[in-house]
């Protein structure tokens, strides 16, 4: 799919009823990619000890230092706000997750040469579905609770460890296990710097090992419906000056259009806060 021809309906069809993922070519400029990569390299060069996910085997093998995360990207450069607010992606997310969808996280993942892959998994808020009894009875993917956007800053190839996924597994809504033959069935999300890979996080996937001599880095954006608790506390992390100057779209992404939870007892004036008729919100 080309950036200039993106239709929200096409993205939603691919995520819900298609393979679960779609590549949009040429979404971001070379200058945006270069600036994002510069910041990611700067903040990850000497910081191997950051929290990461789905790297239990790498931790056991003492190889976590070959995979590095950079969190709180909104506070590290305007280019990351530009990526999060990209109009074609925002339009698709409004249709997929609802008009008031939010951003749950924006981070970078850098896998160094010979860096490890991940265990096959599904993404937040489904990511601990290996404990299914912690979820409501009857939960299913007839409506989505997550969308992921991966923006490569380096080439995503089989050699560099492009994300692997098993098409159509978003309908399973379960954590992949050893008997699922993930690596025998998987395809790759190959892409070029500046592309955007949009996928439903319930689709089985994982980063693959980097067998090349170059880094493989990407910006990872998580979008959620307005009522799902975000993974990163972005509102607190970015600071008051950022919030004050935020665009209407960014305020929405930070969850400021949806005021809950709040201390309802502290509201001293009699108010009809919710409802179809004459509500304050």
Language-model segments: residues:
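Non-heme Fe(II)-dependent double-stranded beta-helix
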Residues: 1-19, 24-132, 138
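Short, surface-exposed beta-edge/turn micro-motifs
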Residues: 19, 146-148, 216
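Short, solvent-exposed loop/turn segments at secondary-structure junctions
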Residues: 28-30, 108-113, 125, 156-158, ...
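Catalytic core of non-heme Fe(II) oxygenases with the double-stranded beta-helix
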Residues: 91, 116-191, 228-237
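A short, structural micro-pattern
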Residues: 102, 143-145, 213-215
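A structural signal for short, well-ordered beta-strand segments
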Residues: 106-108, 149-151, 219-223
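Conserved double-stranded beta-helix
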Residues: 170-204, 208-281
């Amino acid at each position: 799919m080309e950036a200039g021809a993106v239709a929200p309906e096409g993205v939603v069809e691919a995520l819900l009823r298609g393979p679960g993922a779609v590549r949009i070519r040429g979404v971001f400029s070379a200058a945006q990619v270069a600036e994002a990569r510069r910041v990611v390299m700067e903040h990850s060069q000497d910081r191997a000890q950051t929290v990461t996910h789905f790297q239990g085997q790498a931790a056991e093998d003492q190889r976590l230092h070959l995979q590095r995360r950079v969190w709180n990207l909104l506070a590290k450069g305007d280019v990351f706000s530009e990526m999060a607010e990209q109009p074609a992606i925002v339009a698709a997310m409004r249709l997929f997750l609802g008009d008031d969808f939010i951003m749950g996280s924006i981070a970078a993942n850098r896998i160094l040469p010979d860096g490890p892959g991940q265990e096959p998994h599904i993404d937040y808020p489904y990511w601990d579905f290996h404990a299914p009894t912690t979820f409501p009875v009857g939960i299913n993917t007839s409506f989505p609770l997550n969308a992921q956007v991966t923006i490569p800053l380096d080439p995503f190839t089989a050699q560099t460890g492009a994300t692997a996924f098993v098409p159509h597994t978003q309908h399973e809504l379960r954590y992949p296990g050893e008997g699922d033959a993930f690596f025998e069935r998987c395809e790759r999300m190959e892409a070029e710097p500046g592309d955007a890979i949009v996928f439903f996080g319930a689709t089985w996937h994982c980063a693959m090992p980097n067998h090349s001599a170059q880094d493989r880095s990407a910006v990872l954006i998580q979008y959620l419906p307005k009522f799902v608790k975000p993974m990163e506390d972005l509102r607190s992390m970015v600071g008051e000056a950022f919030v004050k100057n935020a665009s209407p779209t960014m305020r929405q992404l930070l969850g400021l259009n949806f005021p809950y939870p709040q201390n309802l007892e502290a509201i001293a004036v009699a108010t009809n806060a919710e409802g179809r008729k004459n509500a304050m919100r």
